[in-house]
Amino acid sequence: MQIDLKGDRPIYEEIYEYFKDAILEGRFKKGERLPSKRALAKEMSVAVNTVRAAYDALSCEGYIESVEKRGYFVSEIGSLYNFKAQPINAARPEKKSYKYSFAITEGDKESYPIDKFKKIFTQEVIYDEEFYERDYQGLYGLRHEIKNYLFKARGIKTSEDNIIISSGLEQLLTIVFIILDKKLRLGLENPGYKELKTLLKLNNIDYEPISLDHSGMNFERFKRANATAALLTPSNQFPTATVMPIKRRFEFLNWAYGASGRYIIEDDYDSEFRYSSRALSPLKSLDEMDKVIYIANFSKSISPLLRLSYMVLPNELLKRYYEVKPQINSTVSNIVQILVKDFMKGGHFERQLNRMKGIYNKKRLVLLDELEDIDGLHAIDSMAGMHLKVYVSGVDDYEDIVKALQMSGIKASRLKDYYLKEEAMAKDALLLGYGAMDEDEIRSAMSIVKKIILDLKK
């Protein structure tokens, strides 16, 4: 018998697997007698109890049966219908690797506070009183720290009861869709976060992409869409980096106050990364009638590996939330929540945020300096966020430039990649993110960008 006695598994499991496979493959027929326990033990130089354990497992699962004073015999096990499975073409699309990345959603992976997290984990997390707690809404301690941060840094007054912890924008929006009326019609910024289309379709949400103007989402077009909610990024519109002025903010707030069942969902995307002044106040801080659902995350400020986002719900939506709360519990582990709680409680978060702002601002200035050396390029610098919008003179469609960059090992995108719905007057641009690369990599990548643009303009 070909039984491996030197494998990682216990010997009795090897014996069990050998006979099981032999029976299933028909090498041992119904009624055929197996070697006695003593005979097999002697042949294999193992203990009788080892063979007994294997035979007991085979007997328990119905492969063999014991006949008193006669031994063990193969049972009638029937057979499965023999068919040839058709292969399913479910291969993942090949993920292209790039030497340089101007991706506008990527941050600096080398600057995340890994060492500080290690120290917090070993000294505090496993001893935390919330370590074994289960809270569908997210651990109270973290919600308390977020509440304090929102009041101090973002001017938002709320309570721990209004804060919900989850693993990302998509998960939080799914909760919002469940809570809001089934007749929800959502107005979306166009261009915007294109991946939302899949989420909206999965949740059967009626939506209308609304074009932008110099102040953000066009309010008159939004009103004509007969929406019941608006999803906005007012402090740093993604991906145009447009800042919504106070007049437009008041227009949307007054619209929300004008009828019951109307809400604004504010995604405070990258709002902390403002380099010319203090961070802009969020729409939620102006909300006197509690009609703004506020969403933010720690992806760029701490690390995207945490997958930790949070939401502030208006009071009038809490009752509905508590009704469905057990079905939509937090998807963030207690370990991660306690890590971030202690990170914030110890004052590390504010220091980390200021540190990251300094790092990204230096990269922004390097990229701007490199762009100035290329004739015919005009960069729109909002002095916020983590990418620049770049126009090339004489170019209306940037598809060829992006393709050429990708062929040269540079990850990049263009404005038209982010349109949820095509617009006749849509303006295209090259989008260059500076979060993922260090300063030297930005300079090296820009030397390739310069050559490609000059070649395409010949």
Could you tell me what each predicted segment is?
Residues 1-122, 131, 322, 326-333, ...:
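N-terminal basic, amphipathic alpha-helical segments
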Residues 130-260, 272, 278-286, 290, ...:
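Conserved core of the PLP fold type I
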Residues 164, 190-199, 323, 327, ...:
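A generic "structured core" feature
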Residues 206, 263, 410-411:
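Residue-level detector of anion-binding/catalytic polar loops
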Residues 267-268:
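Walker B catalytic acidic pair
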Residues 279-298, 319-320, 430:
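Conserved active-site segment immediately N-terminal to the catalytic lysine
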Residues 294-382:
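PLP-dependent aminotransferase class I/II
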